[in-house]
């Protein structure tokens, strides 16, 4: 039985890693992919790719591949640092060996390690050739250079859109540039979002609440806390689907998020025509906090109230006055600050063309 072994931090996994994995798989009967790293790694944690998350993504990626088995090694738990000392290698290799738990033992099994770094070749060969500290799971070491596919995790982290097609698909969502266009009603958010999406051919997320109300034939005065809970959950789900979709080439844009839902919920608590209470609002805000994790906005364009209110037959006209729209805008600003998004905000206070050109300019800067 021939066994291939690859290992790495995979932050993110990319085609360079897959070159190793696919070769190890094709040249052996089974292939082990060892995901390793530390707790509290700044480069990983800041983008949400903790060791456990990377391990989970890779397991999911290969769940239908009977040849590939995914292991995890937490270097922090092993008490080893990033140096390539003999003792560190001994501890690390023993952990890998124990996890393999090969029921057949090591008789008649050939273990080949596939690595993309020359230093790893030397270290593993030294362990194999040292009669005192040799490990039974090292027979051969194969170096797979990246001259034909020069890519690294560092290059991707520094410029993900440039190397988007090199990123393994499950990891792409963590490098997506997510843009939100927000504001009160009738300021041109939806039109601006669609126009930018059309111009660049990027996925966009629309206001779920509007679609929901049209489908069920509901007016604003029919809404209850249950409807608002549905808005919060499904809006997040729709945006996440766009971020994870194969159509995402690095940038996603949305014309609403849960801050807008909360803005309207606050306003409707004050409206005697709508059955929404302060306690209902507290429930909704807690739900919004709970589902905030996962979607990060890289840029938020905020449209202040200035345009003529357009009655499209679906809008709640009680909210149509400039005074009410200004109150709602102030609520939205307060929510953006409360939820920690204000540092991402840029106020768009130009005409329709000027606002389009500013967002277009921002998207183009991300594509350079």
Stretches with model-predicted labels:
Residues 188:
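Conserved glycine(s) of the Walker
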Residues 230-295:
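Glycine-rich phosphate-binding loop used to anchor ATP phosphates in small-molecule kinases
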Residues 181:
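Hydrophobic anchor at the beta1->P-loop junction of P-loop NTPases
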Residues 192, 196:
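Hydrophobic positions on the alpha1 helix immediately C-terminal to the Walker A/P-loop
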Residues 268-337, 346-354:
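A glycine- and Lys/Arg-enriched "phosphate-lid" helix/loop adjacent to the NTP-binding pocket
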Residues 198-238:
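Conserved substrate/cofactor phosphate-moiety recognition/catalytic segment
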Residues 1-177:
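Nucleotidyltransferase catalytic core that binds NTPs
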Residues 185:
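The conserved Walker
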């Amino acid at each position: 039985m021939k066994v291939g072994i690859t290992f790495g931090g995979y932050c993110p996994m990319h085609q360079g890693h897959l070159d190793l994995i696919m070769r190890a798989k094709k040249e052996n009967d089974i292939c082990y992919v060892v995901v390793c790293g530390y707790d509290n790694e700044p480069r990983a944690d800041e983008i949400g790719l903790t060791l456990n998350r990377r391990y989970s993504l890779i397991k999911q990626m290969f769940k239908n591949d009977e040849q590939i088995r995914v292991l995890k090694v937490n270097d922090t738990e092993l008490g080893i640092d990033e140096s390539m000392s003999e003792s560190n290698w001994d501890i690390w290799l023993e952990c890998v060996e124990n996890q393999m738990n090969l029921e057949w033992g090591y008789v008649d099994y050939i273990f080949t390690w596939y690595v993309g770094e020359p230093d790893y070749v030397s270290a593993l060969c030294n362990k194999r050739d040292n009669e005192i500290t040799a490990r039974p799971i090292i027979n051969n070491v194969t170096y797979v250079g990246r001259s034909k596919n020069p890519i690294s995790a560092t290059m991707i982290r520094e410029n993900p859109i440039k190397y988007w097609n090199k990123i393994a698909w499950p990891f792409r969502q963590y490098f997506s540039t997510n843009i939100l266009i927000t504001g009160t009603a009738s300021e041109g958010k939806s039109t601006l979002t669609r126009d930018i999406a059309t111009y660049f051919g990027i996925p966009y997320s629309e206001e779920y609440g509007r679609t929901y109300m049209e489908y069920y034939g509901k007016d604003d005065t029919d809404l209850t806390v249950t409807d608002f809970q549905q808005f919060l959950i499904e809006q997040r789900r729709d945006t996440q689907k766009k971020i994870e979709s194969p159509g995402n080439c690095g940038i996603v844009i949305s014309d609403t998020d849960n801050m807008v839902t909360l803005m309207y919920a606050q306003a409707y608590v004050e409206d005697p025509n709508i059955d929404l209470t302060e306690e209902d609002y507290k429930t909704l805000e807690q739900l919004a906090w709970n589902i905030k994790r996962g979607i990060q906005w890289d840029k938020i364009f905020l449209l202040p109230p200035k345009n003529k209110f357009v009655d499209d037959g679906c809008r709640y006209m009680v909210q149509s006055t400039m005074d009410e729209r200004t109150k709602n805008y102030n609520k939205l600003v307060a929510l953006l600050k409360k939820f920690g998004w204000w540092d991402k905000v840029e106020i768009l206070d130009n005409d329709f063309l000027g606002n389009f050109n500013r967002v277009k300019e921002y998207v183009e800067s991300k594509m350079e």
